[in-house]
Swiss-Prot record:
Domain KH type-2 residues, every copy: 38-106
Name under which the protein is recorded: Small ribosomal subunit protein uS3
GO molecular function terms noted in the UniProt entry: mRNA binding; rRNA binding; structural constituent of ribosome
GO term, biological process aspect, one: translation
Keyword RNA-binding annotated: yes
Keyword terms, alphabetized: Ribonucleoprotein, Ribosomal protein, RNA-binding, rRNA-binding
Biased composition (Low complexity): 237-275
Function: Binds the lower part of the 30S subunit head. Binds mRNA in the 70S ribosome, positioning it for translation.
Gene name in the database record: rpsC
Family: Belongs to the universal ribosomal protein uS3 family.
Alphabetical list of HAMAP family matching this protein: Ribosomal_uS3_B (MF_01309_B)
Amino acid sequence: MGQKINPHGFRLGITTEWKSRWYADKQYKDYVKEDVAIRKLLATGLERAGIADVEIERTRDRVRVDIHTARPGIVIGRRGTEADRIRADLEKLTGKQVQLNILEVKNPESQAQLVAQGVAEQLSNRVAFRRAMRKAIQSAMRQPNVKGIRVQCSGRLGGAEMSRSEFYREGRVPLHTLRADIDYGLYEAKTTFGRIGVKVWIYKGDIVGGKRELAAAAPASDRPRRERPSGTRPRRSGSAGTTATSTEAGRAATSDAPAAGTAAAAEAPAESTES
């Protein structure tokens, strides 16, 4: 069901893409194990960097690693020393040449992984879990591309002896709709009472060939103008924008005009006969 499965895996090939792009026959299991080791290496040493996603692409003799982070300065380090260290560790792990790309995340409040990591950090600092969840929801809903969010915490909440799960939701989060763009993030908070799992679902609208989202985001100048049924525009009188027949005075003036015209036409022949 859509409520239980990972939203990324549920929508692979529909609205989401694979985070590891390579092909192998006999070395498939080795590459999968290596990808897990690469992501674990980047997650353990760069907790403060705010890594949202890691994409891996392989060729015959090269491995390309794209790191999407909210704080690229921490990953790069002073004069690139941290990036060089990470590249050396990855080359030692894979035994191949590594191309490291560090990409900045523009809106970290709308990335589910970063939101989950932020809530987990607050729980580790003894912040009340309800306050942390509501603060994350409020900051995410301020983003224009976020239409709904759900945050769930599971574990010994508040130091209780029995573990439980609580979640808060705002907006729409259609987990069973395949065309829905759902971003999912998971992070664990280490507290004195044990680990608390934080899950975040963010709904960013539907993807139907990209037509609906592009039409909504198009500026007003690019949208087609609606033509009027008649070629001429109605005449307006005054600065208030009223037409000639929209007021009592205007209707009276228009009704008196034909009568005055007929009276003038009737008087004209009479004057000519008298002369």
